[in-house]
Amino acid sequence: MSGIFGALRLPASVLFGSGQRAAIGMMTAQIGKRALVCTDARMGQDVQFKAIVADIAANGVEVKVYDRTEADLPMAGITACVQEYANYKPDVVLGIGGGSCMDMAKCVAVLLQHGGSLRDYYGENKIPGPVAPVIAVPTTSGTGSEVTPVAVIADTERGTKVGISSPYLIPRVAVCDPELTLTCPPGLTAVSGADALTHAIESYTAARREVTADLAVKNVFVGKNALSDMFGLLALKNI
């Protein structure tokens, strides 16, 4: 096949702007009546985070918080969260924080829906079907996990980080409120910016793949294309 090819896989809703965190409670209530929020210990004590959780509850949603997400997302932490809330059966899982918190929400959504071990899903397109809806709320500016079909975890037994990739991992909703990044430590802000720059460079310089009708059906990663070029170059200019 020849000609222009482009592919985008995105959440059903992406909200961006200062103060948009005020929509999280309403968006959650549109999806279900029981919510599980995944975050880390620092964010769990944040005033803005507590206000978000209170707003979810004020919208008539029962909400539980798991605030023990660790950096780089060791598999044991994911397993612990799933075991703790399996009987709760949340209708929606929220990841609020950095990339590890959002990836925690994605992995928990997979295991609550399909069971098994995370190792069953290593690689590309191993998730057999839809997972519990995820709402992703980044509090750093670099990961991009709020709009991607990827989760990265640390398999400590194997001593490596592993990716799980599937369109089913794309969050239902992404809420990007720049005000949530203002309390991010300066060092983490710098690293997050470098991370965002790296993602943009990788997008723009990726190798092209042969374009076929089933390229985006059989593959999560479709290579360099017209749309990735457009957004990658825009990101490079803005960063």
Residue map of PLM features:
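Glycine-rich phosphate-binding loop
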Residues: 90-103
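Active-site segments that bind and position negatively charged phosphate/pyrophosphate groups
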Residues: 209-239
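A glycine/threonine-rich phosphate-anchoring loop and its flanking beta-alpha core
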Residues: 12, 113-212, 220
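Conserved active-site and cofactor/substrate-binding residues in soluble primary-metabolism enzymes
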Residues: 19, 23, 47, 51, ...
